[in-house]
């Protein structure tokens, strides 16, 4: 499965949350099916995401690329360190959590 294509299709056709602060809030509330983190996510944010996702039983996938690359894949002109897939849309991105 092409992860990058899956992320892009999910951003275009589904419902996603971009950004670490909003992502942490969504994980705390259990709003989402999958968390995707960039490889260079700051350690404190990474620790928070992993801890809260364990509590809410949300799978976390570490994207093998930087936040700049993740932002570019999402079609955004800024860095994206964390995104939450709430609804995948036409994407098959949720297959990576298995």
From Swiss-Prot:
The record's listing under PROSITE patterns reads: RIBOSOMAL_L30E_2
GO BP annotations, alphabetical order: translation
User: Which InterPro entries does the UniProt entry name for this protein?
Assistant: Ribosomal_eL30 (IPR000231), Ribosomal_eL30-like (IPR039109), Ribosomal_eL30-like_sf (IPR029064), Ribosomal_eL30_CS (IPR022991), Ribosomal_eL8/eL30/eS12/Gad45 (IPR004038)
Q: Which residues cross the membrane?
A: none
Per the record, a Pfam family?
Answer: Ribosomal_L7Ae
Which N-terminal residues, if any, form the signal peptide?
Answer: none
The UniProt entry's GO CC annotations, sorted and at most eight, read:
cytosolic large ribosomal subunit
Asked if the keyword Ribosomal protein belongs to this entry, the reply reads yes
Xref: Gene3D superfamilies: 3.30.1330.30
| Sorted UniProt keywords | Ribonucleoprotein, Ribosomal protein
Q: Which GO terms describe its molecular function?
A: RNA binding; structural constituent of ribosome
What family does this belong to? Belongs to the eukaryotic ribosomal protein eL30 family.
Enumerate the HAMAP family for this protein: Ribosomal_eL30
What name does this protein carry?
Large ribosomal subunit protein eL30
Q: Which organism is it from?
A: Methanosphaera stadtmanae (strain ATCC 43021 / DSM 3091 / JCM 11832 / MCB-3)
Name of the gene encoding the protein in the UniProt record: rpl30e
């Amino acid at each position: 499965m092409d992860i990058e294509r899956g992320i892009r299709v999910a951003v275009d056709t589904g419902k996603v949350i971009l950004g670490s602060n909003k992502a942490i809030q969504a994980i705390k509330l259990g709003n989402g099916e999958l968390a995707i983190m960039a490889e260079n996510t700051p350690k404190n944010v990474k620790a928070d995401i992993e801890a809260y996702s364990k509590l809410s039983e949300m799978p976390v996938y570490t994207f093998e690329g930087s936040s700049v690359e993740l932002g570019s894949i999402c079609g955004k002109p800024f860095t994206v360190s964390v995104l939450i897939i709430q609804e995948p849309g036409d994407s098959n991105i949720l297959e990576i959590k298995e």
